[in-house]
């Protein structure tokens, strides 16, 4: 039979586009709120981050603009406002004339739910992070992606795979309680351009295992190069 009370899978797409304007988000801050002008500024920055969701995906960190800002009165307050802003990413009604479901409205509603779920999941910390990261050398990256990696992951910027390694470590629990397991190219283990990243990982992380799978480690044509686990 079917198990009663089975929880829904915690799955979200991080590449959804924000439809609302930044002014719509900023309007969520009441005029009489403490530090209203500052909160509106932060919501505009957060909106700009989600506006890049189709390009950056799970590299997005909704709290990144707040982490180094001691003037923020309450991160929880901003997170609540962000949730309210994302909640506006839905149509007033899903039903058109003759009670026919409108495709555009339905898509917008699905986008809204995805943004809400993605924001919550990207703000979490996990005991186990497992993925096959995307591979893309810096020379082939979009300029916006280049700038983002340069600003936030300077030691890993030469390949998107290494950037995602850093992002996965961010998503893992602190104090050694989190484990990251990924598949990625193995050339960064010896190339000089990654020496700074290797050093900081050796100092700040515990390496449990690295397995060199080599060429054709997977049975698909795209895996015809050296990878590691």
Which residues does each predicted region cover?
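Class I S-adenosyl-L-methionine-dependent methyltransferase module
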Residues: 1-124, 128
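Signature of N6-adenine DNA methyltransferases within the class I
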Residues: 1-28, 120-229
């Amino acid at each position: 039979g079917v198990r009663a009370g089975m929880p829904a899978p915690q799955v979200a797409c991080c590449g959804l586009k924000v439809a609302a304007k930044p002014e719509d988000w900023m309007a969520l801050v009441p005029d009489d709120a403490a530090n209203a002008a500052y909160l509106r500024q932060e919501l505009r920055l957060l909106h700009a981050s989600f506006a890049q969701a189709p390009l950056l995906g799970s590299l997005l960190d909704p709290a990144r603009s707040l982490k180094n800002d001691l003037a923020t009165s309450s991160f929880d307050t901003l997170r609540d406002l962000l949730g309210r802003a994302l909640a506006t990413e839905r149509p007033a009604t899903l039903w058109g004339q003759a009670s026919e479901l409108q495709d555009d409205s339905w898509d917008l509603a699905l986008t809204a739910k995805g943004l809400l779920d993605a924001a919550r999941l990207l703000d979490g910390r996990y005991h186990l992070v497992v993925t096959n990261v995307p591979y893309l050398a810096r020379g082939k990256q979009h300029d916006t992606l280049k700038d983002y990696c340069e600003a936030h992951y300077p030691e890993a910027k030469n390949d998107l795979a290494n950037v995602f390694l850093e992002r996965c470590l961010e998503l893992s629990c602190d104090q050694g309680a989190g484990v990251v397991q990924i598949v990625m190219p193995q050339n960064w283990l010896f190339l000089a351009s990654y020496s700074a990243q290797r050093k900081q990982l050796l100092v700040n992380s515990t390496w449990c295992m690295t397995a060199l799978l080599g060429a054709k480690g997977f049975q698909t044509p795209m895996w015809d190069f050296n990878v590691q686990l």
